[in-house]
Amino acid sequence: TAGLVAALILKTRFPSKKIQIIRSEKIGIIGVGEGSTEHWNEFMNYIGLTFQDIIKNCDATFKSGIMFKNWHDKDYLHSIGPEHEIINGQYRTYYGKVISHDWSNKELNPLGTWENTVDEWHLDNDSPYNQFHFNTQKLNDYLHIIAEQKGINILDDEIKDVVLSDQGDISYIVGEKTNYASDFFIDCTGFKRLLINKLGAKWNSYSKYLKMKSAIVFPTEQKQEIDLWTTARAMDYGWMFTIPVWDRCGNGYIFDSDYITADQAQQEVEELLGKKINVGKHLKFDPGALDRVWINNCCAIGLSASFVEPLEATSIGTSINQTFLLMHRLPNYTKKSIDEYNKQIEIVLHNIRDFVALHYVTNKGHNEFWKDIKNVPLPGDLSDWLAHWKNNLPILEDFIHTGSYALFKDPHFIQILAGLELFNRDGLLSEYNMLSDANRKLADGIREERNVLGMNKVMIGHKDFLQRLRAKE
């Protein structure tokens, strides 16, 4: 996916440049299903796709966010959707009221989400959500077609070696069928990192902070109604994701192999589901990122550049933002271009690392694994921020240092902190009560507006909505 995303963005930005993809049909893709972040909409708009295209061609479903089950005393939904744009920058006032007054978690999420319903108005208008679940294979097949339509040459070959010039650049790559020379190379070879490793890139592990290192993936049948969210369920030794696409669900148990084996992980899942599962793959990984994702005339994107456990479905979003930044830095690039790019991407990846680590600041402690998780150190200055946020809602200014390409900022952190009940409600109430009467009334007005909209909208089930979309010409 990363290679196709990168090629499509770069071809759109540089239409006169020859771009080709080398991929091998013998090498499969990782994933039984895939989810996006809200950055997918920027990608679609940039290359000229519509949400109807994605729904029809990729067995896609809408994604409002991620439902966290069994991580805390109450389930909660991390949902950042277009509805927040309606609030015109005042969501913090509303969030402050919701959290400090202990309103339901549903009040933080778009209308109808918890009921798996969608406003019928969207059938002929804008997408109700800016995130999606995809059938990974169909997504790749569809992007392949779009890439060829845009003039990207896709060649079936397997990379065997990389040859460097005397100056240390990549001169050409050696394929099974022929050699390929180019001015610039994008390494999307996944965990193998065939190109960037040749240039001396080193792996910086996040395993000190993120303990998951194995996964089993497997499909299950689709439910009668299709969830509007990815489910992330805390398990005895990690967590399990469920990604609902049109005709089935893709699942994976992400676990710490220091505590259980893959067979034991499978047994735990089967006991939970009450049935046997067919495990497609057993994956092992070391969470982390390259020390430099851009070296000389090569940039690593996707799994070649980084891998943080898929708790917040960051893989596609990271590839998109990496490529958008690259397209600005690439023309007439200098050593300064490369250095600044690497600094910015390191910040992006640390933002993901810290956000994922936050999810494990939970009160779970029913077994040795979850007790040990409590003693895992927090990365960077996250512990200092948690102490600050205990009595203060996160604000955009807390994330200025992350730049415009970071995936997670104040609204995302607010929802996880609220879901894990890491706020001191009295502190937030004190902050809220310092607001003017007009601003406090605004928070009540937002709630009233939601209630009025809820009464007047025609809401239909997610599956029914998708069926109607798929049937439209």
Task: Identify what each model region corresponds to.
Residues 32-119:
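Dinucleotide-binding Rossmann-like beta1-alpha1 core, especially the glycine-rich loop
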Residues 235-286, 306-317, 329-332:
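Conserved FAD/dinucleotide-binding core of flavoprotein oxidoreductases
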Residues 8-18, 137, 141, 462-473:
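Extreme N-terminal leader/targeting segments of oxidoreductases
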Residues 62, 328-473:
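Long, low-complexity C-terminal extensions of enzymes
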Residues 9-33:
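Glycine-rich FAD pyrophosphate-binding loop
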Residues 288-353:
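Conserved mid-domain beta->alpha element of the FAD-binding
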